[in-house]
Amino acid sequence: MSNQVIVTNISPEVTEKQISDFFSFCGKVSNISTEKSGETQTAKIQFERPSATKTALLLQDALLGQNKIQITSEDGGAASTTDQGGAGGDQAARQEDKPRSAIISELLSRGYHLSDVTLEKSIQLDQSYGVSSKFKGILESALSGVRSVNERYHVTEKANEVDNKFAISDKLNRTSSLVSTYFHKALETAAGTSAGQKVQNAYEDGKNQLLGIHNEARRLADAKNQAEGTASPASSTPTAPAEKEPTAPTTESKTTE
């Protein structure tokens, strides 16, 4: 599969940077070009890794500006579901290595509007193939940045609990987070349909691990911000993800109808 996707039906007011920021959640963008196509825009986006391309293909019907975008791979192929995020176990974890549900959650937390189909597919893929071992390295990377303030914030003790508690029942108490709220809203919307049942089954099986990742990552990031005196309110403008540092939802988002 090509590392390039073609995105059509983009609202004319959307800038190239905004397009790049949006697709950077999928992985590193190596090149982007746009051109006018009637009353809309078409963009060609080249990713560094194939796994980012496959994640991008999940974002069909997402809103960029006022329009629902359409996404195809350069070779016209459909998204593959056979990879778990990138090869090369000795390389540092990247955005592409995150579970696709985590990437979708990040997009929602930044104010982007995604379809329920995108949510369903991301959960199903993560349920089928699990969480990349390299993604767990992201938590360790975040931890390394706050070890200098460990005595004050006891961050290490908290972080060391992560691997052992992903599947423990007390993680269910964290379902008041945005991720859980959004998932439940989506499930309610799809209630009574076969698709809704599939999403619910996949979600119920996998939510402990996903919520554990998000909440522990958020706690580490917050502790780091407090220690460095850099904590600030979440921006209302969607922005690209910071490299190598996990983020979790902090503002309310909703799905498209």
Curated annotation (Swiss-Prot):
The root-end lineage is: Eukaryota, Fungi, Dikarya, Ascomycota, Taphrinomycotina
Query: What residue spans carry the Low complexity bias annotation?
Result: 75-84, 230-257
InterPro entries the UniProt entry points to: Nucleotide-bd_a/b_plait_sf, RBD_domain_sf, RRM_dom, Vip1_RRM
**What name does the UniProt record give this protein?**
Protein vip1
Q: Which Pfam families match?
A: RRM_1 (PF00076)
Give positions of region: Disordered: 74-99, 217-257
Quote the SUPFAM superfamilies the UniProt record gives.
RNA-binding domain, RBD (SSF54928)
Q: Using the record's annotations, give every residue carrying the modification Phosphothreonine.
A: T230
Single Gene Ontology MF annotation? RNA binding
- Give the RRM domain ranges: 3-76
